[in-house]
Amino acid sequence: MSQLKPISSHMDGGAPSTPGKFKVDKSPFVHHRLRWHSSLAKLAFWSFVFLGLILLFFYRSPSSPPSSASDRRLLRHSSHPSAPWGGPSWEKRVRSSARVRSGRLTVLVTGAAGFIGSHVSLALRHRGDGVLGLDNFNDYYDPSLKRARQALLERARVFIVEGDVNDAALLTKLFDVVPFTHVMHLAAQAGVRYAMKNPASYIHSNVAGLVSLFEACKSANPQPAVVWASSSSVYGLNSKVPFSESDRTDRPASLYAATKKAGEEIAHTYNHIYGLSITGLRFFTVYGPWGRPDMAYFFFTKDILRGKGIPIFETPDHGTVARDFTYIDDVVKGCLASLDTAGKSTGSGGKKRGPAQLRVFNLGNTSPLPVAKLVGILERLLKVKANRMVVKMPRNGDVPFTHANISLAAKELGYKPTTDLATGLKKFVKWYLSYYDSGKRSSG
């Protein structure tokens, strides 16, 4: 398996030499030493700044409230799980869920009650892998949908531990009880627009939470291989299409994108220092049954049925807004292939023994379509005319288009999406009408 090149640092530029008594124009060696010391000081400074930010949100004082009521609610739910853990009965359930057929994987899936996490957990279980879920069941969107996914997993004998990835004691306990071979890290604070009013929840989940997970993994013996959810949002303001893994990712358009970019840099650090095998997956607009209510295809369906206006964004120059919509089953295949091809971590007890695998892949459909096309397909499937409203794209972190180059994933993972948007939306609408229009549930 070929390895990707390490993520380049953005602190490589030299700094002016400190003025003093030395005549650097006459001593290239001294000039080189001064530049080296200056660069070293610069690197040390930014390292301490970054470490300080991590510690700030890791050890946030209880007397310092988050920036909004929503932040307080989210952080409370994610930091203090309502279900107790520990004890013989609990450990028995954990071991039973993680029990594996001979030769298969033993996988901890974080965010297991989420959209992608629940699908991945079911797919792993169905092929005979040992699966244990972890989820904090926060209320970013209706928790009852997460509970319904949990019930689906329980019928497949997958146990979800209710807790948070920032709970170091819980993670340590889980790794003590089960020798996981792999971790599928899908727990994160999602959503681009939500970050504008609830920034602290993104740092807590996507930065501090990722560090907490990597800390547990690097200290485990044996160390698991880690596959985690990055995002296509890291491409930010990139205008080159299609987006390739080697494209620049230093211009995020939202705080969500910035936290995912930070996650990729953190992954590089833990791979380099501790020998963790890490694979990052850049998902492109995943949709399908059991999806997230905050996604456009989901709330468009709800609003079309209710006769509400459907905003169709256009760019300031009247351009089309398009997305690389990717069906959930195709994404799950990419996730499983990433787990199956992940190299072993090379550390032991927090010490690196040799170079470890570090990869990043795009998982998209590579066929972007205008959002207006999405609405048209929903109109036909629902047999209801949408009340369309063309509006300017707000400055809220959204980007005008996404388009994945999947050639690397095709080569390394055998990844090949097969579901077009019309077929995928047909399956989603069938599920939606069955789940919400049965008279038993409200879509909000």
What are these regions (language model features)?
Residues 2-286, 329, 339, 419, ...:
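N-terminal Rossmann-like NAD(P)+-binding domain of SDR-like oxidoreductases, especially those catalyzing
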Residues 5-6, 56-64, 70-92, 96-101, ...:
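C-terminal substrate-binding subdomain of Rossmann-fold SDR/epimerase-dehydratase oxidoreductases
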Residues 143, 147-150, 264, 298, ...:
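Short, surface-exposed alpha-helical segments at coil->helix boundaries
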Residues 192, 291-292:
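Activation segment of protein kinase catalytic domains
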Residues 213, 263-267, 299-300, 334, ...:
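Aromatic/hydrophobic pocket-lining residues that form π-stacking "cages" and hydrophobic walls in ligand
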Residues 227, 236-240, 275, 291, ...:
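Proline-centered turn/helix-capping motifs that create local helix->coil transitions or kinks
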Residues 241-242, 293-301:
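A glycine/serine/threonine-rich, flexible loop-to-helix segment
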Residues 285, 289-291, 320-323:
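Heptad-repeat alpha-helical coiled-coil signaling segments
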